[in-house]
Amino acid sequence: MVRREIKNFQLVYGGESYACSVPFSVKSVLSAAGIECDELSGVACFESDIYVDDAALAMRNFYLRVRGINTPAAVYVEDKLIGKVDGKTPIYNFDASGILRKGNNRLSIRFDSSDCDLNYAGLCETVEILRFSAAIIDRVLMTQKHEDGSVKLDISLDFIGDKSSVRAVATLVSSSGQIYYAGLTKGQGSIEIKDPLFWWPRGLGVQNLYRLSISLYGEIDIEDNVEIRLGLRTAAIGDGGNLVINGVSTLLMGAVYIPDGNPDITVANDKATASVSSAAMANYNCLIIPLGAPKPTEKFYDLCDVHGIMVVEEHSTLDDGVISSLHHRSNHPSLCLIDLIGKDTKPAEVESLSAILPNMSLRVLENQPEYFGLPSLPSMKTIRSVVPEDERSLFSHSVEAMAEEGAIRNMLMSVADRYPYPADLSAFAYASALASAHKVGEVIKNSRLSLGQSGRGVFYRLNDKDLSISASAIDCRGRWKPIQYYSVRHFAPVTLYADMVDGVVTFRASSQRRLDLIGSLEYRIADASNHTIYTESVEVEIGAMTSPTLHTVNIGDMIKGREREFYLEYLIREGSYVVSRETMLFVPEKHFMFKKPSLKVVITGQDRRFSITIASDVFVKDLELSFDGVDAVFENNYLDLTSDAPVKVNFTITGGIETSFHLKDVLELRSVADLK
């Protein structure tokens, strides 16, 4: 087979022509030419030449392979229609045999505004010219059969061309280097894996991946070769908000993710990388792609495979285009569940669809799930970059223009419940984001303690595409809000919770790991100066995937009359390692009698990797770490300092290279006490 890419095109629109190279959209090409249009109409054509010589004409088969078109389009060669694109199917192979002639042949991909939004019409990937004598691989279908600790991988190939004169060989390589071979007779065959290495979601095990290579041999040369990465796992619907992965009931914990939808595949992949990496760092094990959201790129699924993040896709229908897309992605172990939303789906249809998509679970819902979210302001760095200084107040035109419906009202109410009245917009941004993190934490807590019976441990949403006051955990510039840092704790494999009713504190734990935990529950009552009033330690055992009550204690008499001065610190220790640590105030933060801290700070490191060590002489609640003019991602933030023992936090600079001396100069610290 001979393969040639077509990357360079001319956009023909409005009587003008503009040079462009894949990836592109109508909007991106016009913007590069200095033309800004809010609404585009009519027909836009992307044209290129296909040169054919005598050697090419000697080939028996000539196909165009088109990928990366997410809107309806029509493909022409020399003004002859050779195929239509529906924008749903990931790959199209159009037969151009008998149409192409010696010399230059005009290729035209046409988008009509009556079928799509021209702003986003374009190509994310190059068009390929495929010339071959016998056959090439069109599609690879795989089914996993798990039985008695082994896996049978059934492989089925669809061909373009004459498959009778080719033979196929499959090679499977495990992450440990073990190799399996199989011949595929007439494109069909199986590989028996006696000692499989399973793919596990994040927090439950290793994300083992296999590499499958399929070579198609003709009479003389290799006609085609396809490489696929896959994971071995089972997936089934569990109770409540759970999925059963490899026989283990797993609570879905994460956020709704709305892909950027940028037609520039490079930009889209960069944003997908940032989003999935951020989710993994914050202990997410799932992302929900909501109904109507742009389709993620292939890179997104690759990243979720590597990081162990389960993907749930919502669909209102499973038409041929959607099924083709799901087939194309069925090798990804991360794509575990399809939520089919609609009242008209019949059980027989579900059974039929499950047979078509054997590596995914299918759940039918009457209505689209709703996930809790509470709005907060973007990072103040983001606000300062776009909002004029004289407009930096909550009720200014610039700030109100960023707000989603009801956002400011909801923020005011949530801040009023917990915090002192903020003195300025920066303080309000800090308080509103903390309030959002705490409210979401309550929803996650209920889900975890009920083992998913109260619903998934999922909030709305991970990311913003545009500047807005929203419920997102990461703003449009990629800056983490408190809810993203709190997610490190919300979604940790083991979390500890404390609730007090009438002076009685109940400690409960949630475990989302496959091993039991034997350790100690330690708690203490302390004052604002971190002096211990009372302390106790009890031995505890937490079973795998359980949410037990660990201990109850009546502290009403100890804190009576001094609720504004005392707080509760509690933790679980496994050996010498602190698995989970939290604090609880007995009154809202606005009523607690904080003392002014004296903080000692040391920053060490170089280039982009640093650590900050902080110590305080008094209790500090939700200490925010940030730098003026420098972006960083911390392994932990919004810290509670409960003793004079130093706390060390590693962090990574996301911009250029820095020095510890400069970072010390631009360090910004604030806590809840600074709101008063």
Predicted features, each with a name:
Residues 308-318:
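Beta-strand-loop-alpha-helix segment that lines the small-molecule cofactor/substrate pocket
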Residues 254-259, 291, 313-315, 340-342, ...:
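A cross-domain feature marking catalytic cores of carbohydrate-active enzymes
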Residues 236, 343-344, 462-466:
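Short, internal active-site loops enriched in acidic
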Residues 11-13, 69, 368-517:
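Substrate-binding clefts and catalytic carboxylate motifs of secreted carbohydrate-active enzymes
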Residues 108, 287-288, 310-312, 361-365, ...:
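Structural detector of well-ordered beta-strand residues that form the stable sheet scaffold
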Residues 263, 313, 467:
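Short acidic/His/Gly/Ser-rich catalytic and metal-binding motifs that mark active-site loops
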Residues 1-298, 303-307, 320-327, 336-337, ...:
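Secreted/periplasmic carbohydrate-active enzymes, especially glycoside hydrolases
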Residues 138-140, 288, 322-400:
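Active-site region of glycoside hydrolase catalytic domains
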